């Protein structure tokens, strides 16, 4: 069989496809964190109704998690195909990352934690679950902090792609808090 970098061709192809799926997930990730509130000026400026914005958010979430699931499972299959020691080795590289080690700033345990948090968030956002247990869906959506935090530890460069969403989310949160404080202050004044 053909070899590439000392690996069978199919294994090299799987590595590359898994890598490109991870990199490709950054595009929907960069837009996914744009806040969904009925009063969002950003969505109104884009000409989208709240319902259309929610549909876009769901589609981006499904696309991103589909790509990240292929990324995670693809690498796990590739590592298990190379040797039974590679998967545990890759997942215990937490303390060995750096210039002199082979992981080159990719922290796979953090990636696994981020992916598992993303899977839980994704599962609770499915229509059949969301409609029955909206309270759990809403609380589980706070896992986005774990997802983005450990994703940034996994591959720090992803911060560049998540930064616009974080800025929009923070600005929206600040606006909502400002409105609440103003309403409470007005209510106390009367």
Regions found by a protein language model. Name each.
Residues 1-190:
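FNR-like FAD-binding dehydrogenase module
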